[in-house]
């Protein structure tokens, strides 16, 4: 399966409350073959998931590459990934501000 299929399957599983399968599907989307857009979307969803779980180190692992590549992603994909880039930046900012709560 390619990244887009893993992403769609994971979103469906998460919407049905199948958390473990959804997370594994998102990880497969990030690690597998496929388009960069789907991989970026999966990274942001995983990052948000780990922020909500209070696992900020794991969240940074997925959100960091999106924030670091933001300029290139914007140049290459115009505004297609703007929402994901903004969300990654916002979540990383939250981690910086409130990370002490998880310690």
Residue ranges and their predicted role:
Residues 1, 37-39, 83-85:
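Residue signature of alpha-solenoid helical repeat architecture, marking inter-repeat boundaries
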Residues 54-75:
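TPR/TPR-like (Sel1-like) alpha-helical repeat modules
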């Amino acid at each position: 399966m390619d990244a887009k299929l893993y992403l769609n399957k994971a979103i469906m599983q998460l919407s049905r409350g199948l958390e473990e399968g959804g997370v594994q599907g998102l990880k497969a989307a990030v690690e597998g073959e496929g388009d960069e857009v789907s991989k970026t979307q999966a990274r942001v969803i995983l990052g948000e998931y780990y922020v909500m779980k209070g696992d900020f180190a794991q969240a940074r692992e997925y959100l960091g590459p999106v924030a670091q590549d933001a300029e290139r992603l914007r140049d290459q994909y115009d505004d297609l990934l703007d929402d994901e880039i903004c969300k990654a930046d916002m979540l990383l900012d939250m981690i910086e501000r409130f990370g002490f709560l998880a310690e």
